[in-house]
């Protein structure tokens, strides 16, 4: 007997050809393929399939997986599909059909007595997000980010020091060692970036040897051509990434001078629009070069009626400026331009800007990377219509795959960790986020880290069931005790990874090495590799890409906002 579409979806979730709305946006995803077998779907519960001799076989743990997410809709840069997900030893081991191969056909993921189940029927599963622009100002950022769906931090800092409030630099071997020891205790993947503003290499090299996975050149420490060249020379020798926040005041040169100093070498250009910093008014031109991997930070995303007003105060606090000094006011005002902020939304939609990050507590919000990414995608669909390849009103797969890559696979590629994290693919760390479609991008249901639930929406612990109020996010068993060391990863430079650093610092978490940072280009930014010729009018600040004016109106209303947040 065939089930009706409605009955089937209510039991097993949507299948091939079905469309799912994302939160209260105008974005829809359409299922492209279904790996589950009709009539042989596995489902856990009373009177359901995953029982001894039925959907559960007799095999021992070596022949079955530790965890299965059943009937999930996987949303990733490579596709939007329906499948079961198998996890073994904290890593994704299978994407396909789960069940008992003794009695069911086409089983690729075996369920046994040693298998746990997470019911993902009607749910969306994405890779844990990667925030590649984090100021380590307070450790409480970690829980805030986890509860939004972020599972990896890349950045620098030492706490609420003045330098860390402004720059993502953990300066020097001593501070890098301390921050690596702190990272070992936090339930999130972390890679630390050192200070790259120096004209001689010795002080940079010792930071990489101490474990830094990258270096940050920042105008507040000095972003001169000499410092840029020196930093990139060191990066090329050690295969690490250079993140760059260039010279807003154009004191030591203009954007052309910075590009000349870079000499075609790969850089990660932070907040490429410029409100977060960089050559005024035309730093946005850098997103058109093959060696520049451009990103945005979330306070300008998307462009709204409130964006301009809130930036001045943020600038004063984060960069230790004085509103009573005319030159400090001029510095701030030179960075806040309606025209380039408006163009930023469009450049993201066209795939010219490749990544989105937070700039946490330093002109950015650590818990809103994912939220603001999808708000921007919605705003662009409203203002610009469907993208080429999105066939119908209920199919935004091209746009959705473009935007999810901005905070998952592309920052992973940029910083040399895509072999470990950044996508829902076999062999990678099982950092997964489970969403109810109505809460997609806003409030995840479960955050899985290294194969174990690390954070979840949870009701009163004294209640008879898990759901009574007060319901809020709570850290779970995966975030506690020694379990957190088996489910999180600290990333190190190759030279540190191959040394005795982990023993010296007594690090006990999983350790990953960064690799292939220097041989990547814009063309490797998945679904976000467009390289237009960008021109910025120095008087009006209007932005053109290949001669076409790029602009959009500020939003006065956004989805994924007050409807979901009472306070």
From Swiss-Prot:
Q: Where does Ni(2+) 1 bind?
A: 133, 135, 216, 359
Its name, as the record gives it, is Urease subunit alpha
Q: Cross-referenced Pfam families, in alphabetical order?
A: Amidohydro_1 (PF01979), Urease_alpha (PF00449)
Whether DNA-binding counts among this entry's keywords is no
Which SUPFAM superfamilies does the entry mention?
Answer: Composite domain of metallo-dependent hydrolases, Metallo-dependent hydrolases
Q: Which GO terms describe its cellular component?
A: cytoplasm
Q: Which gene holds the coding sequence for this protein? A: ureC
Q: Which organism is it from?
A: Blochmanniella pennsylvanica (strain BPEN)
Cofactor, free-text remark? Binds 2 nickel ions per subunit.
